[in-house]
UniProtKB/Swiss-Prot annotation:
GO molecular function: 3-dehydroquinate synthase activity; metal ion binding; nucleotide binding
Cysteine disulfide partners in this protein: none
Organism: Shewanella sp. (strain ANA-3)
Binding of Zn(2+), residues: 184, 247, 264
Classification via Gene3D superfamilies: 3.40.50.1970, Dehydroquinate synthase-like - alpha domain
Enzyme class, first EC level, given as a word: lyase
Family: Belongs to the sugar phosphate cyclases superfamily. Dehydroquinate synthase family.
Name recorded for this polypeptide: 3-dehydroquinate synthase
NCBIfam families, A to Z: aroB
Lineage start: Bacteria, Pseudomonadati, Pseudomonadota, Gammaproteobacteria, Alteromonadales
One of the record's GO cellular component terms: cytoplasm
Keyword Metal-binding attributed: yes
Length: 359
């Protein structure tokens, strides 16, 4: 059974399809690809698994070619973005082009940003193959590449035409990548939906064993929340900032440790625990809530402490470059209960230092 969710953004609205064997479903894709020139962007890990399958599905719609990039967050940069532009220009692709992101969050972010920039904007489609990209980065139109001084600092808001989530891709996903995706799944429960958080607590083994029904429910619920938030606040002027729970600390970990050494979801897990500990220090939540958050991350084999090599100074230098900083003030998304969060703009650095040093 295929589930459909709509992201309501007026003229830029688009559907999300969630189910099995969707990469072979030419009927769903046909309206977006007919008489188009198609460039599939993927990586060296995904290409041997799924590239031929998706090429065969799309071959009847128009000219299909591909570009295969290295796999990893450390390659999400301007140099490898240029490889996509070169592939388009060498083939004389015009505004009738459609870019297809076949891969995880790195591929989706880069392909979307390339689509936003190429000839001032061409269509693109998201086909996310990792749990993290299925529940988070493929939905909402955030596209970007990293800079050595900060994560996702060069980018644009640019919405896809459609998101195709084929749950069968998760059967080939390494366990570490699956766990990293669960960090974002858990995040939705903490910041938005207490019932969903409790459901996750009760369904750890079903999810870890890749039970299809459990996966479809978890992915669908995350996409419903993301679609709701994005429909209210496309460009992150308000409520969408709550989706960054754990990310200010997490991005600091990724940048300090070197992109690719910690997976994004791993950094988000540790960052969310730091956010919860900060909230406890400020009297926003009690120890029992912190304990539930830590236990659920731990159940999915995720890190719940920051790297030992990182001290307060190494965190704060990156946190001051965070995109949410306003007027020089670090703004943090902190949980105020299971199922609720808020943005706080005046968190004392002394509190942050105490939390980081004691973590």
């Amino acid at each position: 059974m295929t589930k459909q969710i709509q992201v309501d953004l007026g003229e830029r609205s688009y559907p999300i399809y969630i189910g099995q064997s969707l990469m072979s479903d030419g009927e769903t894709l046909s309206r977006y690809l007919l008489k188009k020139r198609i460039l599939i962007v993927t990586n060296e890990t995904v290409a041997p698994l799924y590239l031929k399958q998706i090429q065969d599905t799309m071959a009847s719609f128009g000219e299909v070619t591909s570009v295969i990039l290295p796999d990893g967050e450390q390659f999400k940069d301007l140099t490898h973005l240029d490889s996509i532009f070169t592939a388009l220009l060498q083939r004389n692709y015009g505004r009738d082009s459609v870019l297809v992101a076949l891969g995880g969050g790195v591929i989706g972010d880069m392909t979307g940003f390339a689509a936003a920039c190429y000839q001032r904007g061409v269509d693109f489609i998201q086909i996310p193959t990792t749990l993290l990209s299925q529940v988070d980065s493929s939905v909402g139109g955030k596209t970007a590449v990293n800079h050595p001084l900060g994560k996702n600092m060069i980018g644009a808001f640019y919405q896809p035409q459609i998101v195709i989530i084929d749950t069968e891709c998760l059967q080939t996903l390494p366990a570490r990548e699956f766990a990293a995706g669960m960090a974002e799944v858990i995040k939705y429960g903490i910041m938005w939906d207490a019932e969903f958080f409790q459901w996750l607590e009760n369904n750890v083994q079903a999810l870890k064993s890749l039970d299809t029904q459990a996966l479809v429910y978890a992915i669908s619920r995350c996409c419903e929340i993301k679609a709701d938030v994005v429909s209210q606040d496309e460009t992150e002027q308000g409520v969408r900032a709550l989706l960054n729970l754990g990310h200010t600390f997490g991005h600091a970990i990724e940048a300090e440790m070197g992109y690719g050494n910690w997976l994004h979801g791993e950094a988000v897990a540790a960052g969310t625990v730091l956010a919860a500990q900060t909230a406890k220090s400020m009297g926003l939540i009690d120890e029992s809530i912190v304990r539930r958050i830590v236990q659920l991350f731990h159940a999915f084999d995720l890190p719940v402490t920051a790297p030992e090599s990182m001290d307060f100074d190494s965190f704060i230098k990156h946190m001051r470059r965070d995109k949410k900083v306003l007027g020089g003030q670090i703004r943090l998304v902190l949980p105020t209960a299971i199922g609720r969060a808020d943005v706080f703009s005046q968190v004392p650095e002394s509190t942050l230092e105490q939390v980081i040093c004691c973590a």
